[in-house]
Amino acid sequence: METPPEMPSTDGHTRAIVTERYVVESKKSAAHVPLACSTQHCAFPLDGSRLCVWSSKDPSHQLLTLQGHHQLITAVVFGNQIDPLLLCSASEDYIIMWNVAECREKTLKGLTPRGTILGSLLQTVLCLRFSLDDRAIAVCAGNKISVMDVEKQSVLVELKGHQGSVTAVEFCPWQAHTLISVSEDRSFKVWDFCVGSLIYSSSILTAYPLLNLLINEENQQLVTGSADGQLWIFSLMEGHHYHCVAHVDVRKKRETFTTRRMMAEQCSLPEDHQCRCRHEADKRGEAEATFPILSLAPCDLCLPDSQRGAFASECTKCLWIGSSTALFILNLASFELEAALHFKEFQSLSVQVAGSCAMVSEPMSAKAFCMLSSMFGSKIAVLEIDLAALLSTQQYPRAGKVLSVLASSCVLPTSPLYFGIIKEKFPKLANTKQHAVKSVVEDRPLVFHTKVRSSGYTLAPHMAMFSPKTNIKHHNKRSSKYKNNYKCKECSLENFLPRNLSRQVAVAQKPVAVSCLQFSGDGQKLACGLGNHLSLVFNASLSGPPAAFSGHDGAVSTICWSHDKRWLLSTGRDRTLRVWSVHRTELMLLLAPDAFPKPVTSAQFYYMDTFILLSSGPEFCLLKYHIDLCRDDIRRYKPKSRYKPIFRLPMTSGADITSLSAVNDFYSHIVLTAGRDRAVEVFDLNAGCSAAVLAEVHSRPVHRICQNKGSSFVAQHSLAYNLFLTAAVGDGIRLWDLRNLRLMCMKWAPAAFCTVLQDTQIRLLKWPSTQQLLSLSQPP
């Protein structure tokens, strides 16, 4: 028995991430010995049949050794109650219950502590689990689950139904009569142990045995892990029918976590060092062995608050994942890794490859304890992990200020946005007046008279002099011209989601796909692009005939309103971009297919209608445009509007852009782009360069980015504008925060495309409230 000194982290920080608090070597192999951890104690078998209890609160206490088993101990578990703290151990001969406090008192008095024998079995017990009140205990032996009464020391019920050995079992916290088990038959079952009946049986989840089980009480979810490093999260809410919420591959999540950190480091370095970092990233991205899920434990991760130098008041619900070579912290809201601790990075650890693992962390605590047994040796070690030090090393490096959608500084003279401001700051009044006179003459219809008379032969019409109206009656009513048909109503926060179909309109006589749609800024118009080359504009109430815009030779793929609601932008599969006049329903600006080398995938108005922002191939382009309102009635077919490319920038990876987004309702310097390499890149057009890269945002390329662009009817916190959504085929919808480039939440939707409405369903997803999102600490 030895207790080595504290070991500093390998990254050069003076604050130790991992401290090996206790090490013991057993006479028997410690490859798969059962381990148990509580908030104050750690229990493990020593030399096969001796049960040892180590105090994590006061390591100076003598190691408590409990003897009573004659065979190898195969299962150990602590009770859920603190006073008294119960400990149960099982072997092939006995199942013994121990009172930890009484056993320690007897040891201090020189007496031999004795436990209570609950029963004797001839089969190997693989799992033990107490109920919440410690009055019952579930014993898993073979494919059978026995629920025993602790006080009466009798078997209450036996549950049979698994085809393989039961590996883990849990009591449901909010349903006292419900018990859930997983087995080597690769399925989980839900039982009512009061009546001894089976409630639900899942299908086979994987080709590998299920090893662990955890119930998240706050979200009412079931988490189970397999031997090949896969996690399944199922909903236990009433009416959800145990549907799968998420499927997590720990190995892929670890690769994504590592790639994002290295991409962030690459963006923060000078350009001459980026090639070397990319080469190192390719070398580190080699495939490794899978991570078997040895243990699962809850973790209330309090993110560091840079302003206070402590922990934030709000904690993120996470999950400890113990594997053979590493420990991981998984965010249960976003299903992304918050931290990864690899044993090989700490060479002085006694256990480098674990055969068994157990973890525990107290709520609102900065420390966690982990217990490991050596796979290829006989050592058992207790590690103390400093969460604050671990998280500080796991943060993405960032060079410069924190990103924000709201512009926090003036436009730089070197910015491409500076061009548009200069041109509009000093308008030429003389030219404006001439255009106005010219438009009055040219906009008149052309009329051919049958009789032409010379001037002077007819009398001029009498002009009516101005006479003010003095008999106007005011009825405290607004003119019908300015009458607002949409009355403001106070919406209930509890029932604000629409649930019933209000109105349905057919956009065409034949079935046609609605490929895109967008409301105008005031919410009174709805534009949609169709697969039959048309663009339609409806009233928000879908009443009356729509305005039709025809001109594309292919399906309309993008449609966008201008901020002043005068113009409508559309792109189609004919590789053209068109700007329409909403009032005239006429084409005002045309970008031919040969304007760009590759098709335009996304386009929108930008910077309060000053520019047109579009993507073509691997780069996005900023266009300065001018709409000529002076139209010759004879040459109506020939638009005189013009455009000029002023700035373009490619993605860092060189991948083609699949979607882009920027705010047009107010001045913002941020542009978001998504590429076919499954990455999202953030560009700062004030600096004219890339600001950040989010690697492997989805398992498939992102086909849609949606930002919080504000509303004229709802007041929001300024930080709420930094939230944006991404969607990918078959990979759900994810909510991100631009301030720290973190995934905040993830939802799964059945529709393939969130903007295609043919043969799909519209699902309203509930996200975390604004207060919950704003309560998260800002990045340093």
Curated annotation (Swiss-Prot):
Gene3D superfamilies: YVTN repeat-like/Quinoprotein amine dehydrogenase. Signal peptide: none annotated. Keywords: Repeat, WD repeat. The keyword Repeat applies. WD repeats lie at residues 3-56, 61-100, 111-150, 154-193, 200-236, 291-335, 342-385, 500-540, 544-582, 588-639, 644-685, 691-738, 752-779. Pfam families: WD40. This is WD repeat-containing protein 27. It comes from Mus musculus (Mouse). The gene is Wdr27.
